[in-house]
């Protein structure tokens, strides 16, 4: 199925029961509500989705009422707790609370998959960019030996070492986590 944007151009966005799927910037993207307050964004390189079972995401999606709409060239999805706006052209994904306050921006053109050879196994280096509020503090990423509690403006190469443990999970003082 195609969604026709308000400006009359067809976007390659397929609606699912609890979200959308589309291709943008050389990757396949799925945005699915797992509950009224949980949205899963799943990105894979290339134009076809990966059917690999996640070792991390074990929650089955709850039956969640989702409203679909448009905001210019963007597609909107809303539950009773969260609104998500997607730009299928740039790959940008914008998250808002139920009052319309912006929580997080998955930056336009912010995701990159760079192929590399990992000891004979084809793999990817992944770069992901987010825009935070000016004074927003974020915590997480595991046990890092940087002497910093806030991970704001830190550049980290996430890999496990003897005294450094990588856990790719971030929590914001605004109450969301990813």
Residue ranges: model-predicted function:
Residues 2-178:
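N-terminal accessory segment at the very beginning of proteins
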């Amino acid at each position: 199925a195609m969604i026709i944007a308000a400006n009359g151009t067809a976007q390659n966005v397929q609606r699912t029961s609890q979200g959308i799927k589309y291709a943008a910037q050389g990757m396949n993207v799925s945005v699915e509500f797992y509950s009224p307050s949980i949205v899963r964004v799943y990105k894979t390189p290339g134009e076809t989705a990966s059917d690999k079972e996640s070792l991390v995401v074990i929650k089955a999606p709850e039956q969640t009422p989702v409203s679909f709409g448009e905001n210019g060239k963007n597609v909107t999805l809303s539950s009773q707790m969260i609104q998500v706006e997607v730009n299928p052209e740039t790959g940008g994904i914008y998250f808002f609370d139920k009052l319309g306050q912006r929580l997080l921006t998955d930056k336009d053109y912010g995701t990159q998959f760079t192929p590399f050879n990992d000891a004979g196994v084809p793999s990817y280096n992944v770069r992901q960019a987010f825009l935070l509020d000016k004074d927003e503090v974020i915590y997480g990423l595991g046990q890092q030996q940087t002497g910093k509690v806030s991970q704001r403006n830190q550049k980290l190469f996430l890999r496990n070492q003897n005294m450094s443990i990588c856990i790719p999970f971030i929590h914001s003082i605004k109450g969301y986590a990813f």
